[in-house]
From Swiss-Prot:
InterPro entries: Fmt (IPR005794), Formyl_trans_C (IPR005793), Formyl_transf_N (IPR002376), Formyl_transf_N_sf (IPR036477), Formyl_transferase-like_C_sf (IPR011034), GART_AS (IPR001555), Met-tRNA-FMT_C (IPR044135), Met-tRNA-FMT_N (IPR041711). PROSITE patterns: GART (PS00373). (6S)-5,6,7,8-tetrahydrofolate binds at residues 109-112. The lineage of its organism: Bacteria, Thermotogati, Thermotogota, Thermotogae, Thermotogales. GO terms for molecular function: methionyl-tRNA formyltransferase activity. GO terms for cellular component: cytosol. This is Methionyl-tRNA formyltransferase. Belongs to the Fmt family. Keywords: Protein biosynthesis, Transferase. Its EC number is 2.1.2.9. Attaches a formyl group to the free amino group of methionyl-tRNA(fMet). The formyl group appears to play a dual role in the initiator identity of N-formylmethionyl-tRNA by promoting its recognition by IF2 and preventing the misappropriation of this tRNA by the elongation apparatus. It catalyses: L-methionyl-tRNA(fMet) + (6R)-10-formyltetrahydrofolate = N-formyl-L-methionyl-tRNA(fMet) + (6S)-5,6,7,8-tetrahydrofolate + H(+). HAMAP family: Formyl_trans. The keyword Protein biosynthesis applies.
Amino acid sequence: MRVVFVGTPEFAAEILRYMVKKGINIVGVVTQPDKPKGRGRKTLPTPVKVVAEEKGLPCIQPESINRKEALEFLHSVNPDVLIVASYGKILGEKVLSLPKHGCYNIHPSLLPKYRGASPIQRALENGEKKTGVTIYRMVKELDAGPIALQREVNIDPFETFDQLEKRLIELSKEMVIEFLEKLENGEIHLREQDHTRATYAPLIKKEDLFVDFSKGAETVKNKIRAYDSRPGARAFLNGKEVKLFGAMAVDSSNDEPGLIHYIDREGAWIGTGKGMVKVKYLQLPGKKKLTFWELRNGRLIEEGMKLEGRYES
């Protein structure tokens, strides 16, 4: 079966690498253009492009996959199916109708829940107990197509974004191979999503990263782990923006929201609107991530200081 892979970040690159390892016939790759990244704003290739070049796969980087040159490339490689993972751009009807078997997206949520760009982060932020991966046939409406394959996993209470994403990548690898085998054997039976149950996971904005310590300890814990380790949950300390990582525990004791109540080797107990949360790491502006214990010993932080979650654009 002739497969074109469409994707951009590391999530997609890991899946592509595995597909090549398993001998899937990848006849072409589509990814986003190179973009400036990091403090130096150096132009870097996408992780998917890196894998494509490493494996000698034909790869294009159109501004839009719906443009003439991209459509010509797709026609030239004559795919049976397009596999899409975290591409970040909309596929138009000409692309969707081009492959013999259609276009299928690998989406890290239990659709119809968490349609959109940030399903892993939003599931963690909302304190979901389970999530999963859905492979569905793409239609014009975002993440609304009929489901071909779906698998569920439990979310651990203190699992971070990095940890959960890694597990969902591994699940996606297994599922895409299973899906392609079933597709080739005519064993795919699509089922429509229940659109009345749809929820959404919009693109993350900077204001979403700030911790509101007036909320309860569970809510604060979930906010921190949803953005751990990237891009990091935010707060203000003495007027400076800091990042928080490693939400480890919650306690029913009460204290002033945002107040750093107690610091030990395991972290800092911080007050919230209901209970306290224990957080292990804090990153000061322009510095590396350190434990609260290290910061206290370095006289950079002390008990009685207050973290605030206000955000002004």
